[in-house]
């Protein structure tokens, strides 16, 4: 009679998410694949632009026998959405974004032409996420945090049990997201960081949309854009 309880305890402590990062496209964007022991996976911000990058992502998922269950964008600037269509068509998954990113997504191909990076945009079903939503991957839960400022509908994904945050372009190591772009607002971004991210434990590992990982505590103490 105690076996189900024991199994639940073991699953809670041992069924950990693995975070795999790829650096893709000319903007050096971080694409994330989060997966558990049951081989279920979430693809976040697939920035794979070139064919060899798409092949690299597919080979990793295939070789590790993963089954993508979710396709999520933290925001829809072009460098984070290049691979949306590829992932959706390969694994038959709809795109999940905040509703305020829909116009940003629709505008992405125009940005691509401006930067000489043309691409085929995602045109399938969209599932809208909001603050407080939970994305489940087996026993694991990722909490959706609404953190606008860099983009109007920017979200972050927080895993409380393992204390990590997929931060997109909100917070970087010793830096913050740009706000000198359409939909950006510096004061809103600073407020998002202070009120949504800096309330998390100092030990939380931050996986950003570009560059190396950091921690909440390190950025509180050292980020020059957030001093004072």
Per-region residue spans from a language model:
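Conserved S/T- and glycine-rich ATP-binding loop of Class I adenylate-forming
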Residues: 34, 74, 147
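Residue-level marker for buried hydrophobic side chains located in beta-strands
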Residues: 42, 72, 95, 166, ...
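Short, low-complexity, charge-dense intrinsically disordered segments
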Residues: 4-10
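Active-site HxH/HxHxD metal-binding segment of metal-dependent hydrolases
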Residues: 48-136, 221-225
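Conserved beta-strand hairpin/beta-sheet module of binuclear metal-dependent hydrolase folds
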Residues: 14-64, 156-167
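Short Gly/Pro-enriched turn/cap motifs at secondary-structure boundaries
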Residues: 22-24, 124-127, 146-148
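Metallo-beta-lactamase
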Residues: 48-49, 111, 140-228
